[in-house]
Regions:
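The alpha-helix within a helix-turn-helix
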Residues: 13, 24, 38, 52
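Amphipathic, hydrophobic secondary-structure cores in small proteins
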Residues: 33-49
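Hydrophobic micro-packing sites on short alpha-helices
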Residues: 48-52, 62-63
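Residue-level detection of the helix-turn-helix DNA-binding "recognition helix"
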Residues: 14, 28, 39, 67
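Short C-terminal boundary/hinge segments that cap the last helix of small helical domains
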Residues: 56-70
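Short alpha-helical DNA-recognition segment
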Residues: 17-35
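A short, Lys/Arg-rich alpha-helix, primarily the initiator
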Residues: 1-19
Length: 70
């Protein structure tokens, strides 16, 4: 099974000098979606699209999939 990792998103925020709070406000994502991102849980394509629009990037720039150990 594959697990989403948003490490690249957090690195991109640092590069753009944005906080997670800034991202939350700019995208209008719900608090629960932001929590899912912090926990590396699955989020909707719509949420990823909003993030990419705000950060002017592609999905591959903010998320990667890693194998889960079972």
């Amino acid at each position: 099974m594959m697990k989403a990792s948003y490490k690249q998103l957090w690195k991109l925020l640092v590069d753009k000098e944005m906080s997670k709070s800034d991202l939350h406000k700019a995208t209008g994502l719900s608090s629960s979606t932001m929590t899912k991102l912090r926990r590396s849980e699955d989020v909707s394509m719509e949420a990823l699209r909003k993030i990419c629009t705000v950060l002017d990037c592609n999905i591959a720039d903010i998320v990667e999939f890693e194998k889960r150990d079972n």
